Amino acid sequence: MIERVKGTRDFLPEEMVKRRWVFEKIREVFETYGFKEVLTPVMEYTKLFQLRSGEEVVKQLYAFKDKGGRDVALRPDMTSSVARLYVNSFQTAPKPIKWYYIANMFRYEEPQSGRYREFWQAGVELIGSDKIEADAEVIALFVDSYLSTGLKDFTVNIGDRVLLDEFAKMLGVKDDIGLMRIIDKKDKLSQEEFLKALGEFGLDENGIEKVLNLIEIKGKPDDVLPLAEELFTSERAKEEISRLYNLVDILSWYEVDEWIQIDLGIARGFDYYTSIVFEAIVPNDLGIGSIGGGGRYDNLIEVFGGKPTPATGFAIGIERLIPILEWKGLLPELKAGPDVFVIPVGDSRDVATAIVTRLRKAGIRSDIELSGRKLRKALDYANRIGVRLSIIVGKRDLERGVVTIRDLESGNQVEVPVDNVVTKVRELLNQ
């Protein structure tokens, strides 16, 4: 027997109906914000992801040579692919461009709670605006996307790469990206491992203490931003803190400030982020950390050969969100499969087929007996697959112009004229 590949999953109908519900809830919100759907190839040239994705992501690439000797990789995220799409074909398009996607990604990492080697994300990219209003629009959509699924007990933590860069300068660190990578891993490492990583990076005890103090500066904006003003003194940092104040004000206009906190220790794992970054956290007992995140990446498009173009976006981790929704009991009761099962008895398949066809054209999920089972076995099958109504099409009933509709939940049944089947089925399903 051939097993499925480690870190991947099969989704049965009962799981797919839940996933589709989540996808459609998020898709609906994306489109109400004016975003349009795109999809890029699952494979790109490996170089695309090596340029600015970050050391950790590059290590986890599913990369190989194709039969033509070209280096290709399965996408580990969509931002790089969408930026490549923009550079290829849309540099002269009206700005800002607002695109969204729902797609699968691949990373070779150790499977654990909420982490798989194939996983799905729903995200957006807003390309062509460097205004703080664009950041606010994207973060507000980030919040509303989670709210659309019924989730309310979450926090969106906002950090800033500019402030982390200034912090690195204050420590005398030249490799600011290296420091950010370590800070980004802080929640994945034990305290001992984190301190060891900072020491191996070259920080002395004083520097390590400053890092530990920095990552504790988090909370509501009114509490944190004044502390940031005390900590950072450079003009660049002051300008960025002013932008954060402005961002928080705009988010209050969107009526999402209830979910917003500032966390100066957020770095995010991709090297392409340039200023504001953010992630969503839900308190849970499942061992799941961030359920999504994003930020501004103003240099990525230029790195890929385009004209300098600002951009911002986010991705929601579907494999992390759905377990949270299930754990909190927020997914509705959803049924996969047909509501009606039509059973021809004897020489009545022509009428049975006509009935199931009318039901389907009326938008009623219907199936028909295809295996030649006798009535009792056909009813047993209908019960086992969870069908609500069974329509028994018998020759004697047809001589009187009727069929029998049996409610498999209550056991009640009723004779209905053939021409009235669709109306009666709708009535019974709505009871």
Curated annotation (Swiss-Prot):
Top enzyme class: ligase
E.C. no: 6.1.1.21
Alphabetized UniProt keyword annotations: Aminoacyl-tRNA synthetase, ATP-binding, Cytoplasm, Ligase, Nucleotide-binding, Protein biosynthesis
Pfam families: HGTP_anticodon, tRNA-synt_His
PROSITE patterns noted in UniProt: AA_TRNA_LIGASE_II
Residue stretches in coiled coil: none
Chemical reaction(s) catalysed: tRNA(His) + L-histidine + ATP = L-histidyl-tRNA(His) + AMP + diphosphate + H(+)
Major location (coarse): cytoplasm
InterPro entries: aa-tRNA-synth_II, aa-tRNA-synth_II/BPL/LPL, Anticodon-bd, Anticodon-bd_dom_sf, His-tRNA-ligase, HisRS-like_core, HisRS/HisZ, HisRS_anticodon
GO BP field: histidyl-tRNA aminoacylation; L-histidine biosynthetic process
PANTHER family according to UniProt: HISTIDINE--TRNA LIGASE, MITOCHONDRIAL-RELATED, HISTIDYL-TRNA SYNTHETASE
NCBIfam families linked: hisS, hisZ_biosyn_reg
Protein name in the entry: Histidine--tRNA ligase
